[in-house]
């Protein structure tokens, strides 16, 4: 099993949708563009958003176990994926890439 690098590539925010549909929340997303985590195999990295992990964990697990080439050639690098979290008000796009380093 391999480690997987998770990089926050882009963070969007839709204040018009938030104003129209969202109840005020105590803790908004604090992910920063360029932020990097290393998943040690299937384990969620410390400090990584639980909701975002729910969105990307299946892809991380597949990459960690040597899989890839999602959706028949979707990514230029077959050992990678671009996956967004499921927050419709402030989605974050994460670039996932399998590393050569073995998970511990």
Map each language-model feature to its residues.
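A short, structured loop/turn motif at beta-sheet edges
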Residues: 1-3, 30-33, 101-103
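Short, structured beta-strand/loop micro-motifs enriched in basic residues and often containing a Trp
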Residues: 2, 8-22
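Intrinsic-disorder/low-complexity, polar/charged segments enriched in Ser/Thr/Lys/Arg/Asp/Glu/Gln
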Residues: 3, 36-38, 91-93
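A structural detector for beta-sheet-dominated domains
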Residues: 7-9, 40, 97-99
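Short, compact, well-ordered microdomains
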Residues: 58-104
């Amino acid at each position: 099993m391999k480690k997987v690098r998770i990089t926050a590539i882009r963070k969007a925010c839709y204040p018009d949708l938030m104003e129209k549909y969202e109840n005020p929340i105590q803790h908004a997303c604090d992910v920063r563009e360029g932020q990097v985590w290393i998943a040690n195999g299937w384990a969620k990295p410390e400090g990584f958003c639980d909701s975002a992990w729910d969105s990307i964990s299946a892809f991380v697990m597949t990459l960690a176990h040597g899989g890839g080439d999602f959706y028949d050639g979707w990514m230029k690098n077959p050992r990678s994926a671009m996956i967004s979290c499921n927050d419709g008000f402030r989605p974050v796009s994460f670039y996932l890439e399998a590393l050569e380093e073995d998970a511990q």
